[in-house]
Amino acid sequence: SNPFEILFIIYPDFNSLDFAGPFEMFFRIPNVKITLASPSRGNVTSEAGLVIGGTEKLANIERCDLLCIT
């Protein structure tokens, strides 16, 4: 079957706990595909300096089953 698609939208100066907790939980669920997106693709830096790399451009995402906004 198709994986359950979870999209995390990550904005600059995000709170790393708001991202890491849900990400770690969803990561452990079988048959889940997690996509990280930001307004302008690439690296996004948290308010504490944590860098999340390789995000997709939000405008290019067509669909998801669950949306998480950080």
Regions found by a protein language model. Name each.
Residues 1-70:
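Extended, subdomain-level signal for the structured scaffold at the beginning of enzyme domains
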